[in-house]
Amino acid sequence: MATLPVPHGVEAGKTGSTDPLRDAAGRALDEKALIVEATARGLTEERRDAVRRKSLADDPWWYHPYAHLAATTGIGIGVLAASIVGMTRLPDPVRATDLLVIPGVALFANYFEWRVHRDILHKRSWPFEIMYDKHTAMHHMVYVEEDMPLRRVEEFRLVLIPAAGVLGIVLATAPLALALAYFWSATAGWLFLLTASLFMVSYELLHLAYHAPTDSAVGRMRIIAKLRTHHARHHDPRIMQRYNFNVTVPLFDWLMGTMAPKRNTP
């Protein structure tokens, strides 16, 4: 049997190159090899389990899945709590115009989620190569549409954002909140942080829920089952580079024309 092409990110037990000087041909191969392999029916359960075992073996000795979950959600919940406390201490009442921040931030966050997923997690680009390697060449190799659930809690590391990444998002958005507080109102600044942190926690918990066993209490929830179907379609390697990039609510998939077509559509 001919040897199938494989993503650089998983070949020979490696988790991926992060060399920013890789040529265009190498990048293109990374982005297409998994699709080619899956189409050729080479993405077997044994093949995926080998990547799963390798990724778990690479976990540092200090890694604990529940500590990871507590850290990522804890940062978001901490910012959320600080925002609520900050708002309660403001002397002025909340104005109706301040509330416009909530839908505005939610809309931008949904777009940001869609754009990062499409253009960073599925396209190798400097300086985000490691994010591509962890997502396309690992997460998508382990979890496919017909086999989404985690096998063990140690696999949280394959699904959750690193705690440092969540902290980085908070630090990156803080200047925007300060700008709103200065140019609009202090309430608007706090509402920005509140909405952004709530969205971030929702992203983490929803993504983890999609990869929970379907017969679990979480997996059986109707809303989770509905949203999981959208995300699971994205885990078909043949279409993962083109469709269903939203993880929370597929608003920008709908707006940008990246909703996966129905299966009976040619």
For the regions a language model picked out, list residue spans one by one:
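Short low-complexity stretches enriched in small and charged residues
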Residues: D30-E37, A96, A186-G189, L208-Y210
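Acidic-enriched, low-complexity/disordered segments with a strong bias for Aspartate over Glutamate
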Residues: D19, D23, D30, G42, ...
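Membrane-embedded catalytic scaffold of the fatty acid hydroxylase/desaturase
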Residues: Y111-P266
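Transit-peptide-like, low-complexity N-terminal presequences
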Residues: M1-Y66, N264-T265
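Membrane-anchoring/interfacial helices and their immediately flanking loops
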Residues: A2, G9-G26, A81-W126
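Long, highly hydrophobic alpha-helical transmembrane signal-anchor segments
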Residues: D58-E113, G165-L194
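A generic signature of intrinsically disordered, low-complexity regions enriched in glycine/proline
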Residues: A12-S17, D23, R27, L34, ...
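Proline-rich intrinsically disordered, low-complexity coils
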Residues: P5-P7, S17-P20, G42, P60, ...
